[in-house]
Amino acid sequence: MKKLFTSESVGRGHPDKICDQISDAILDAYLTWDPHSKVAVETMVSGNNVFIAGEVKSKVTVDVIEIAKNVLRNIGYYSNNTSFITDIKSQSENIAMGVNLQDSDDLGAGDQGFMFGYATNETSQYMPLGITLCNKIVSRAGMLIKNQEFKDAKEDMKTQVTLDYSDPQNVKVDTIIFSCHHNEKYNETKFKNYIKTQILKPVLDEFNLELPERILINPTGKFVIGGPFSDTGLTGRKIIVDTYGGSARHGGGAFSGKDATKLDRSGAYMARWIAKNLVAANIADKIEVQIAYSIGVAKPVSVMVNTFGENKVPEDVVLDAILNNFELTPKGIIKSLNLNKPIYQKSSVYGHFGREDFQFTWESLDKVEAIREFVISKGFNI
């Protein structure tokens, strides 16, 4: 029996991803002028209608409608008939009491919750292979559309990759599904051949993988109606695409539209940074980290590390290495990862983790040596 595992990703024209990009573009606009802005913005798109709502506390105001228009124009789904409804309110005073101590070590979490971070040495990005392939496929397709090389294609797309792990030393691609919005008048044969030869094959070649026999391209036949005209989109509905493609657990909180006092986002970034540095330090082949918080409280209520039985040092030593080398309070996370900068729209498509096109702070490996030194000081060689 085959041992199969599947992951997926979506392009920047997918309705949910349109919303993520609008929400993060609005967040970036606030942070550009007031780095201490507290922002929680949600977007919904449906046909020619765009709804933007949320809570904000900032010294500045921004033109959220113009920001949304620019995002839609850039993707290719804006028209003069697009209408906008906005409802941006002030942040709740009850929440603000716990998170407005921006110069204090007592800066509390903006909400309760738990977050997971994960890393594996399966790829050079310290990411699972499946989600890495999916993100690279849709990213490459988007780049080719932008360069006007992928003819008749539009930005709403999805891909799904099934890997065969029957032989862990010889992982193979079992199935690829690729659905892409296209013009009504197009050459189907050329379109599908281009996808296979110019999108799928170059990505698989990068990982020394062969194209599978089963490749399903637009398996329903046509994909002429796309973007927000085919499906309603919402911010935060692609949380598995945003993270590890199902290879690791998820705390349930979405990222986009939230400033760094929302631990759903910054806590997940910190957990990823921890896990990646631990794996890079050769602590284990794969590691999952969980951090949990209470609203208004600075220190986490729990920290957990799971090495899946592949650890080279005891897990209690690994946990001590985390607690001694990483600042886990909201203020510590924001300062360590420099999260008050307008960097978030870049993260809103093609995955928040394992990215090579941007130097996100949570992807840095600047804690590897400190972790190694700590473990060695406890009497373990790695």
From Swiss-Prot:
SUPFAM superfamilies cross-referenced by the UniProt entry: S-adenosylmethionine synthetase
What is the cofactor note?
Binds 2 divalent ions per subunit. Binds 1 potassium ion per subunit.
Q: Write down the top EC class of this protein.
A: transferase
Pathway field of the UniProt record reads: Amino-acid biosynthesis; S-adenosyl-L-methionine biosynthesis; S-adenosyl-L-methionine from L-methionine: step 1/1
The positions annotated for binding ATP are 14, 156-158, 222-223, 231, 237-238, 254, 258
Chain segments carrying region Flexible loop: 91-101
> What EC numbers are recorded for this enzyme?
2.5.1.6
- Binding residues annotated for K(+), in chain numbering: 42
- InterPro entries found in the cross-reference section: ADOMET_SYNTHASE_CS (IPR022631), S-AdoMet_synt_C (IPR022630), S-AdoMet_synt_central (IPR022629), S-AdoMet_synt_N (IPR022628), S-AdoMet_synthetase (IPR002133), S-AdoMet_synthetase_sfam (IPR022636)
CDD domains (UniProt xref): S-AdoMet_synt
Q: Which residues bind Mg(2+)?
A: 16
Q: Got a GO cellular component term for this one? A: cytoplasm
Q: Name one GO biological process term.
A: S-adenosylmethionine biosynthetic process
Q: Which UniProt keywords apply?
A: ATP-binding, Cytoplasm, Magnesium, Metal-binding, Nucleotide-binding, One-carbon metabolism, Potassium, Transferase
The reactions it catalyses are:
L-methionine + ATP + H2O = S-adenosyl-L-methionine + phosphate + diphosphate
A Pfam family annotated for this chain is S-AdoMet_synt_N
This protein's assembly is summarised as:
Homotetramer; dimer of dimers.
- Report the family membership: Belongs to the AdoMet synthase family.
Q: What is the recorded function of this protein according to its Swiss-Prot or TrEMBL entry?
A: Catalyzes the formation of S-adenosylmethionine (AdoMet) from methionine and ATP. The overall synthetic reaction is composed of two sequential steps, AdoMet formation and the subsequent tripolyphosphate hydrolysis which occurs prior to release of AdoMet from the enzyme.
Matches recorded under HAMAP family: S_AdoMet_synth1
Under which name does UniProt file this protein? S-adenosylmethionine synthase
Question: Could you tell me which species this protein originates from?
Answer: Mycoplasmopsis synoviae (strain 53) (Mycoplasma synoviae)
Its gene is: metK
